[in-house]
A protein has these predicted regions:
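Structural motif
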Residues: 5-7, 85, 107-110, 134, ...
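Active-site beta-loop-alpha junctions enriched in small/polar residues
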Residues: 89, 113, 138-140, 156, ...
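Conserved phosphate-binding/catalytic region of the ribokinase-like
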Residues: 104-107, 121-143, 147, 160-258
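Active-site glycine- and acidic-residue-rich loops that bind
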Residues: 113-119
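Short internal beta-strands
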Residues: 60-63, 134-137, 153
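Conserved N-terminal subdomain of the carbohydrate kinase-like
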Residues: 2-4, 12-109, 120-122, 245-258
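Active-site metal-binding loops of divalent metal-dependent hydrolases
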Residues: 9-10, 113, 206
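Non-cysteine beta-strand/loop elements that form the S-adenosyl-L-methionine
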Residues: 75, 148-156
Length: 258
């Protein structure tokens, strides 16, 4: 089996589930009564965990201080409405490029949340040194991604970067479009079935992880996008950050026939 390496910064994803039944007497804000708290590794660690949930050969290079970087969401227990997100950030040390064992892996995935772990020059260097680099980045795209195999971005990221996406680069860009599915080379790949979205947190990581796994298994990008759509559609129907599972045979076969 092919080996996957994920590179990128990680954090702690914390969900604080609450009830809110009254406003504070001194301020026009709800009083939150905490019911439950959950912690999960996030960002690049979430990509790695999703890959490992369905594929055995994946390793991660990330920042050691990831537990000091947190995203805390205060969420209404019943409606799943997020009241507020509070971020606590620490300095992320830059990666040591000379230590990267890229040749040991068949696919290299860059999960870049633009926190300082990877610069544009670092990513460009990795792409120049390996033929199969998949990128998911929060940075505005530019010439530094020209040697990537695939760049996965969402609608918002596409709008910010479209001025820099040349016709040649466009051939390597996958745009995830939420409930519509994903677009690649002018073709829209719809989700296999309409679902009731409860929480889209981490859905991009899940899509990216499933894309990596299926491409490692098949080398077929069309097949990989359909598989990623099917996996991500199973994640968004659950609360919080959840791991992907192999989609049901029926749902996945339906997606392949679209």
């Amino acid at each position: 089996m092919k080996k996957i390496l994920v590179i990128g910064e990680s954090c702690l994803d914390r969900f604080v589930y609450c009830h809110a039944e009254r406003l504070a007497p001194d301020l026009p804000v709800p009083v939150l009564n905490v019911i439950e708290e959950t912690d999960n590794p996030g960002m690049a660690k979430n990509v790695e965990r999703n890959v490992l949930s369905i594929y055995p050969h994946c390793e991660l290079i990330t920042n050691d201080n990831w537990k000091n970087i947190s995203k805390t969401r205060y969420v209404h227990r019943n409606s799943n409405h997020t009241f507020i997100r509070v971020d606590a950030e620490s300095r992320v040390p830059r990666i040591a490029l000379h230590d990267l064992p890229l040749k040991e892996y068949d696919l290299v995935a860059i999960s870049d949340y633009n926190k300082g772990f990877l610069t544009e020059a670092d990513i460009q260097s990795i792409c120049e040194r390996h033929p199969n680099v998949f990128i998911d980045t929060k940075k505005i795209l530019g010439g530094w991604v020209k040697d990537a195999k695939v760049i996965k971005i969402n609608n918002f990221e596409y709008e910010r970067s479209k001025h820099a996406i040349t016709p040649e680069l466009c051939e390597r860009v996958i745009v995830t479009r939420g409930e519509q599915g994903a677009e690649y080379r002018g073709v829209l790949y719809p989700v296999p079935e309409k679902v009731d979205v409860k929480d889209s947190t981490g859905a991009g990581d899940s899509f990216f992880a499933a894309l990596l796994v299926r491409y490692a298994e098949t080398g077929d990008m069309d097949e990989s996008i359909r598989f990623a759509n099917a996996c991500a559609s199973k994640v968004v129907v659950q609360k919080g950050v959840t791991l992907i599972e192999r989609p049901s045979a029926l749902a996945y076969e339906q997606s392949k026939n679209i």
